[in-house]
Structure formats: C-alpha cells, structure tokens
C-alpha cells in the first residue's frame, strides 16, 4: 500500500538495558461486597469462536509538533494545545511522495479519524488540505485520545523522573500486568480501562470499514505517541520490544511518525511497521511464548475488571452478563493456551534454519522451564 514505502534507515541509538520482567500471576482478584442478584444465575454457555473476519490495515499516525512539545509539557487532557507552524509543515509533508512515510490519497482510505485533541485534528486537516481534499470527512473518536497522565498532568517532559513515572503503568501493561495503576488517573486508571477505551475505538474504525468490504481495507487514524505505542504493544501478536525500547530513547514516536498494524478484532493484530521500519510477522520462539502467556494472564484481569464495573453499577442484569462473558472469555483463554504454545513451538521449529528439530524443541523446553 502507498503508506508503506521502502524502509528508512534507523538512527543509531544509545546502549540500553532491558530489565527482566517476571510473568507473575494469571489474573486479578477483585475484592468486593456481595451484591444480591434477582433469581438464579443462568446456565453458563460456552460458544465456539470462528476466526473468519476480514483484515484491515490501520495506519496510526502521531500528530505534528504541538506547543506542548516545544514547551516540554505533559498535556493529556483534551482539547490540548494546537500544533506549531513546524507541526503544520510536518502534517502537509505526509502528502508529499518524497516523504518515505507519505500517506496514500485520502480517497484510498475507508475512513479518516482523529482524537478529540486539537493537535490531531489540525494534523489531519493540514494533511487533507495538502493532499487536495480539504473537505474530506474526518471522524472524531474520544477513544483515540492520549494516554492520561493522572497526577503528572502539566509536569515537565524533561524531568526524567516524571517521564519514567508516566510510563511505569503502560510498560507493565505491555507485559500483561494490566492491574498496575496509572497514578492518579480516573480516565485510564489501569490497563483494563485503557484497553477498553482505545480498543473500542479501533473496533469502531474496523466495523465502519468492514460494513461494505468484500476483502481487505485500510483506514488512517491520527492519535498520540503514548497511546499508539502502548495499545499496539499490548495487542499485537509480534511485539518487537527491542525496536520499542530503541524508539523510547528517542521519544517513542517522532511527530507524524506512524505505526501500521493489520488484522481484525476477532483474529487479532499483527505489527507491520514501526516508524518506517518493517517488523517480521513471525515474532520468534521466545516472543511467541511470551504472547501466549500474556494472553492467558490478560483474560482473567479483563473479566475481573468488567465484573467489578458491573458490581459498582448495581444492575443485576449487567452483573449477570459480566459473569457470563467473563467466564466464557477466561475459559476460552485457558482452553486455547495449550494449542497456542504447541503452535508457537512447531512454528519455531519450522522456521529454524540450519538447526535440527531436536535443537528447536530443546530451546522451546528450556524457554518454558526458564
């Protein structure tokens, strides 16, 4: 597609140390008072899932340079600061064929979207104008908003401690620990709430395009660096953590940088490229096993969160529905886990070049034991 041109050469990055992350616990237990439910619970029905959805290519684009970027302010509440003159130039450059990451003609996309922030909407508008389509429809989705900073709102991005505290929660969520809080945030209090918010926006974009699609289709969404990178790393089947941490040293994503994913809400998502660097579809053995364990851990956390939300709402029907859905989701994750691990191991053996199947199996067993 037009938005995926030849690779750009990555800038050299400083040495970095990747901290080991322990995959502890398989879920979150919510301690809550018992709420009476009218009548007995219905029988729990387990449904089979058919993976037959059409794939979408989604280009997630960070906004152009904003006044907050220039002043070094963490601003995560809409409407936020506008873009600068340089930011407007960056947005217009997205329509230039000389840009290695230039976007396709607006008419190519099934939908063009932006968050509630001024900076994303201005970036989209300036690109559309430069592409000769100033009147092209632009849909606004609050789910695409920046990852909320909580108590860090308005603090300096140049303060390394503040920047680190802002990323503690998101980094934990990427490794399956959705329960870790985002300090002081009522918008994104934890990974479950953020997953629901941004994931619902992506699903809405998908549904809008899939309505009339007989085959694959594409959409573009203008969002923010932290929300784009966090949700993508939480959800894709082939997360490239080395590439992520290298980009983290440079601010995660540059202004108008892009992350491209492909897939659908039913079968899941694959990372295609990160800021112009293509990503292998097969994540490799260790990353594949990590994703299998991550998916197993996430299911009970999401179920527990939705049940807790229903309990707080106090509607017995909502509580019953949350229990039903949560049970089905956790059971599906537990049932799918053994086969997912087997598929990951056999896939790694098939892709291992120059080594025997026994060596590959030994590596797999060592990874599981470690």
Predicted feature locations:
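Charge-patterned, long linear interaction tracts outside catalytic cores
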Residues: 201-212, 219-224
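Composition-driven, intrinsically disordered low-complexity tracts enriched in small residues
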Residues: 1-61, 66-67, 105-106, 116, ...
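A structural signal for well-ordered alpha-helical segments within the folded catalytic domains
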Residues: 92, 118-122, 192, 196-199, ...
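Short acidic/His/Gly/Ser-rich catalytic and metal-binding motifs that mark active-site loops
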Residues: 66-71, 149-150, 230
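Short, well-ordered beta-to-alpha junction loops that form the rim of enzyme active sites
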Residues: 114-117, 143, 217-226
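Active-site metal-coordination segments of metallo-dependent hydrolases
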Residues: 77-86, 117, 181-192, 250
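Active-site-proximal alpha-helix that buttresses catalytic centers in soluble enzyme cores
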Residues: 55-140
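Phosphate-handling substructures
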Residues: 130-200
């Amino acid at each position: 597609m037009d938005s995926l041109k030849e690779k750009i050469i990555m800038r050299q990055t400083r040495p970095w140390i990747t901290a080991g992350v322990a995959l502890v616990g398989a879920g979150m237990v919510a301690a809550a008072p018992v709420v009476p439910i009218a009548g007995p619970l219905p029988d729990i029905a387990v449904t089979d899932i058919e993976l037959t959805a059409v794939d979408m290519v989604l280009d997630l684009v960070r906004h152009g340079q904003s006044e907050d970027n220039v002043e070094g302010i963490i601003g995560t509440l809409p409407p936020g600061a506008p873009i600068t003159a340089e930011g407007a130039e960056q947005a217009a450059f997205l329509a230039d064929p000389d840009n290695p990451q230039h976007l396709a003609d607006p008419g190519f996309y099934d939908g063009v979207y932006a968050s509630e922030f001024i900076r994303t909407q201005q970036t989209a508008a300036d690109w559309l104008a430069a592409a000769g389509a100033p009147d092209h429809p632009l849909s606004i989705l609050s789910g695409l908003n920046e990852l909320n900073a909580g108590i860090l709102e308005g603090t300096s991005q140049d303060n390394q401690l503040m920047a680190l505290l802002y990323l503690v929660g998101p980094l934990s969520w990427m490794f399956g620990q959705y329960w870790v809080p985002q300090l002081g945030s009522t918008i994104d209090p934890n990974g479950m709430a953020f997953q629901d918010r941004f994931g619902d926006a992506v699903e809405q974009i998908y549904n809008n395009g899939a309505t009339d699609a007989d085959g694959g289709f594409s959409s573009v969404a203008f969002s923010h660096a932290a929300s784009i990178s966090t949700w993508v790393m939480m959800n894709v089947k082939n997360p490239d953590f080395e590439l992520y941490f290298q980009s983290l040293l440079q601010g995660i994503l540059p202004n108008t940088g892009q992350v491209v994913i492909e897939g659908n809400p039913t079968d899941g998502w694959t990372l295609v490229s990160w800021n112009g660097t293509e990503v292998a579809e097969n994540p490799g053995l260790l990353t594949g096993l990590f994703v299998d364990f991550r998916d197993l851990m996430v299911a009970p956390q999401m179920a527990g969160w939705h049940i807790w939300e229903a309990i707080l709402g106090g509607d017995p029907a909502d509580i019953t529905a949350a229990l039903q859905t949560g049970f089905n989701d956790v059971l599906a994750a537990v049932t799918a886990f053994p086969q997912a691990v087997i598929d990951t191991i056999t896939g790694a053996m098939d892709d291992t070049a120059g080594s025997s199947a026994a060596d590959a199996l030994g590596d797999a067993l060592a990874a599981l034991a470690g």
